A protein has these predicted regions:
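Active-site phosphate-binding/coordination module
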Residues: 27-123
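A general structural motif
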Residues: 1-3, 37, 99, 148
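Conserved residues at the C-terminal ends of beta-strands
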Residues: 9, 66, 154
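Conserved acidic, metal-coordinating active-site core of Asp-based
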Residues: 94, 98, 105-164
């Protein structure tokens, strides 16, 4: 038998777009593929801390997280490449200049730029969700010790996105 590898996104692939549930048939198929010697990975834009336990409990061989900035295989952290402070500052300045809402994520924390009120409904939703779940949410994005794996922006118009 030739061993194969499969990668699954979380949102809308492993989960239902309607209610976020994971179909039992999906869990069975992943476990059966692993039992047959195939490698099963999650490949997600989420940082590892945002991969909920219900996904980990399915039993994957590894995870490609944070848009490829962090890779885990067989329980080991085999690759990690966060953004450096200079890059983060350039991104933060562009977000402030164009008035987009921005979220920086790392495998340890999530950080919104709160120098002005968040405006986009999805940014507000995620901010409240992270707060409700007790995430570490430092506010000093300009601290030289702050680092991030990835960022997300929310914009109100295509022109705003183009300017960013």
């Amino acid at each position: 038998m030739q061993r194969k590898i499969a990668f699954f996104d979380i949102d809308g692939t492993l989960t239902s777009e309607v209610d976020g549930s994971i179909p039992a048939s999906t869990i069975r198929a992943i476990r059966e593929a692993r039992a047959n010697g195939h490698l099963m990975f999650i490949n997600t834009g989420r940082c590892f801390q945002n991969v909920e336990q219900r996904f980990r409990d399915i039993g994957f061989d590894g995870y490609v997280c944070g848009c490829g900035t962090n890779i885990y295989c067989d329980g080991r952290d085999i690759f990690y490449h966060p953004q450096n402070h200079e890059t983060i500052m350039a991104i933060l300045n562009a977000a402030r200049k164009t008035n987009v809402d921005i979220l920086f994520e790392s495998r340890k924390e999530v950080c919104f730029d709160l120098t002005r009120p968040l405006r986009h409904p999805k940014a507000l939703y995620h901010y409240e969700e992270f707060k409700r779940q007790g995430y570490d949410m430092p506010e000093d994005l300009e601290n030289p010790n702050f680092f991030s794996d990835k960022f997300v922006i929310w914009y109100e118009s295509p022109m705003q996105l183009a300017a960013f």
